[in-house]
């Protein structure tokens, strides 16, 4: 690594992913590189790329605007994987072919090449790799789009997926870190990306960093609601209110830097939009959301009427929700269902206070002794709400939801809404994840608008839309998995390129202490290209 005076810090903590700004600067003079590879973003995909390159002996510099690592992963849940040891232990019979058919059917137009590669390699490339670093998966749960349970969770959610990878990265002497530094531009020389311009967020000073390759691992743009709506899928109405549910760093600055350097975008109108957002009471602007739910509740629109199957798939509920004006609904439930209300996120799992921060907060929840009073407080038509609850309760008594098919004869019907006090919580659609992004080839190299490789630039993780596997409709666990996979594959591509440039074998891999044995490459670039061709 070339000489520079940046302060590198190594410590294990949790945080948000990198945010960047756009632009590119053309360079002409020959400058000694600061690293062989610069990775922008210390989230799951960036750390995976760094560790894989570290094993190849590559000199890596990881740059992040925060003082800590973690990324959007800290808001995430689990990983979808196929035919894993944990599935086998639990008696879950699975196969690559079954997973491929499930996912292609669900996503409608997921990238078939990457889907095929993922289902055939997720065990080796993801499960075996992370468990070799100390990750422990403790449960596998069913999820939409899957005929068997494939959604793997660690104890303590995704934090326990990130930290072992981060600890591994910290153990490698050839990986350095530059914190509190915001990547703002890509450097170009004769059409090749050769580095970045970074701004020290504490001093305000800007510097250039040079490398043979740059890996952008900057995440999505789902915090930028205007950009989400400007790139909304054409056959769905745009919601008139959309809350923010992504990490604060998901501003799309990586997209801006890549496109300023000539990269193309692909599937940019694909978003994973949640339908269960409640305004965060801690946000004075009421633009950010918490994700919440109550499986026992009934939902009504602004007219006080049910409008969807509350137990349906998110993709169907979203289509129904964005057609409402306004694009909002109220969860209606009674006192017997209060304990069924939950808010996602570690800070909300247990609340020692006697007062619930949502249910006992008049700004977030309306509560009344009668449905008529509740309707008045929520701004809903009283007669319509009372009629909707009455019809709903009658269908529960009859054992069949003839309006929206939530339950059928023989199903366990939800409880009736009949015990005061009654609750109404207003809900909104929420941004979450990008399912499209920077266009890439089979080696994770960014492509320009002509489909040609943009030399020196790689895009991994959510920045490339999680490999396009999610297609039109997202799959649970199909964001963290592609983050790891794409980070590793980009690193393998770079290792092969650097080795070829030296006309010699790659440097010896660095052993990771948590591994049981000597590391072995799981695939070659030729294998990947043959599969994806």
Where do the model's predicted regions map?
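Conserved N-terminal/central alpha/beta ligand/cofactor-binding core
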Residues: 58-59, 65-176, 180-185, 226, ...
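Beta1/beta-strand and adjacent pyrophosphate-binding region of the FAD-binding site
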Residues: 31-45, 61
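A glycine-rich dinucleotide-binding beta-alpha-beta segment and adjacent secondary-structure elements
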Residues: 185, 384-468
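Helix-rich C-terminal "cap"/substrate-channel and partner-interaction subdomain
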Residues: 326-422, 490-493, 497-532
